[in-house]
Amino acid sequence: MKQSNLCPDCARAALRLPRQAGRGAIWLYRHTLSPLVGYHCRHLPTCSVYGDEAIGRFGLWAGGWMTLARLLRCQPWGTSGIDNVPAEPPGGARWYLPWRYGRWRGVND
């Protein structure tokens, strides 16, 4: 039987697709809607930069939950100031407990 010539990096590329799709959505927001709405984020780095970095570092699932928590904190009664993406995911975070990925109040403990 003939052995097929499958791409050796196909599995790795397939696993990167969700991450690239999430980062692509953020890129699209930054270059279309954000200039129309205006730049007025309460945090540094901005929420879109935070989301791009979180998804790039932790993947779409964990980084997406971190970004959602950040977006919910970025409102008039929310937090403000310097709020970087954590270097590692929170200790109690699991894929089946996604809300534990986000920091829902406060900035950089």
Curated annotation (Swiss-Prot):
InterPro entries: Membr_insert_effic_factor_YidD (IPR002696)
Keywords annotated in UniProt: Cell inner membrane, Cell membrane, Membrane
Domain of life where this protein originates: Bacteria
Lipid bilayer topology: Peripheral membrane protein
Cellular component per GO, a single term: plasma membrane
Entry's localization field: Cell inner membrane
Family assignment from sequence similarity: Belongs to the UPF0161 family.
Known role: Could be involved in insertion of integral membrane proteins into the membrane.
Full protein name: Putative membrane protein insertion efficiency factor
Biological source species: Rhodopseudomonas palustris (strain BisA53)
Taxonomic lineage of the native organism: Bacteria, Pseudomonadati, Pseudomonadota, Alphaproteobacteria, Hyphomicrobiales
